[in-house]
UniProtKB/Swiss-Prot annotation:
HAMAP family: GTP_cyclohydrol_B (MF_01527_B). This is GTP cyclohydrolase FolE2 2. InterPro entries: GTP_cyclohydrolase_FolE2, GTP_cyclohydrolase_FolE2/MptA. One of its GO terms (molecular function) is GTP cyclohydrolase I activity. It is an enzyme of class 3 (hydrolase). Belongs to the GTP cyclohydrolase IV family. It comes from the Bacteria.
C-alpha cells in the first residue's frame, strides 16, 4: 500500500481556470438513489429517492466538485418536508460555491387506503417528484404527482342499453407551490374528481361499489382535466400548474389525452 506524503498537496483540478469562457447552466450528478425519510401527516415514512442535483458553473471554472453532491445527501438524513427541501438546495449552493442550482428527487409514496364498503385497508403507491430551483436569490418549489384513477365514458353509457367502457387513467399534476402542500392533499384533488378512485385491495361488496360509482360518475378525459383544474385554480398554495390526463382506452389500442397549463401570475 502506498503511503501519501503529508507534505504533498493534491492538485484541485476542478478549481483551475478554464480558458474557453463558456458558462455551463447545469452540471452535477444524476440518478443517485438514496434512502429518504419523509415528513407526512401520519408521521415519518421511509422510502427510496432518486436524486438529480446540479449547479451553474461559471465560464472561468474548469469543473464542479461532484463528491460534494453525495456528501450533502449523506449529511442530511433528517426527515424531509418542503421547508427542509428548500434548505437543502440552499446548502448545496453554499457547498458548491454556486449562484444557481437545482435538486430533483423522485420516489414512490404509499398511502393507506380503506375500502369503501368492507373497510379493509391496503397500500396504494403514487409516483411523486419534488423540485427545488434556486436562482437570482429566489427558490421555486415544484411538486409532481402521478395519480392512477378510473374513468368511465359518458358517450358509451349514453348509447348503450347496459354497461359502459371504462379504464384506468393516469392524472399527472405538476404544480409550482406558493405555500405548504402535502402530497396527499394533491392526490385527493385528482381522486375526488375521477369517475372513481383506486384501491390496492377490494372485497366483492367493494367491487360492486366501485363499478356502480364509476357508472354514476362518467367523465371524458376533457372532464377530468377541467374538473381538477377547477380545484387547482381555487387553491392559493398553487401558483402555476401543468395538468395531464391519459385514459388507457379499453376499446382502443391508443390512449385519450388532455393537457391544461395555467399560470395564475399571468391571468
Amino acid at each position: 500500500m502506498n503511503d501519501i506524503n503529508p507534505a504533498f498537496v493534491m492538485p484541485d483540478v476542478q478549481s483551475s481556470v478554464d480558458t474557453r469562457q463558456i458558462v455551463i447552466q447545469r452540471v452535477g450528478v444524476k440518478g443517485v438513489r438514496y434512502p429518504l425519510t419523509l415528513k407526512t401527516p401520519a408521521g415519518a415514512v421511509g422510502t427510496v429517492g432518486t436524486f438529480n442535483m446540479d449547479v451553474r458553473l461559471p465560464a472561468d471554472q474548469k469543473g464542479t466538485h461532484m463528491s460534494r453532491f453525495v456528501a450533502l445527501l449523506e449529511e442530511n438524513r433528517a426527515p424531509l418536508d418542503l421547508a427542509a427541501f428548500r434548505a437543502l438546495v440552499d446548502d448545496m449552493l453554499v457547498r458548491l460555491e454556486a449562484d444557481a442550482g437545482r435538486i430533483e428527487v423522485s420516489f414512490p409514496y404509499f398511502i393507506t387506503k380503506t375500502a369503501p364498503v368492507s373497510g379493509v385497508q391496503s397500500l396504494l403507491d403514487y409516483e411523486v417528484t419534488l423540485v427545488a430551483e434556486a436562482r437570482d436569490g429566489q427558490t421555486r418549489m415544484f411538486m409532481t404527482a402521478l395519480v392512477p384513477v378510473t374513468s368511465l365514458c359518458p358517450c358509451s353509457k349514453k348509447i348503450s342499453q347496459y354497461g359502459a367502457h371504462n379504464q384506468r387513467s393516469h392524472i399527472t399534476m405538476r404544480v409550482e407551490l406558493a405555500g405548504d402542500l402535502d402530497v396527499e392533499a394533491l392526490v385527493r384533488m385528482a381522486e375526488e374528481e375521477a369517475s372513481c378512485e383506486l384501491w390496492g385491495l377490494l372485497k366483492r361488496p367493494d367491487e360492486k361499489f366501485v363499478t356502480e360509482r364509476a357508472y354514476e360518475n362518467p367523465k371524458f378525459v376533457e372532464d377530468l382535466v377541467r374538473d381538477i383544474a377547477m380545484r387547482l385554480n381555487a387553491d392559493d398554495r398553487i401558483v402555476a400548474y401543468t395538468l395531464e390526463a391519459e385514459n388507457f382506452e379499453s376499446i382502443h389500442n391508443h390512449s385519450a389525452y388532455a393537457v391544461i397549463e395555467h399560470d395564475k401570475r399571468h391571468q
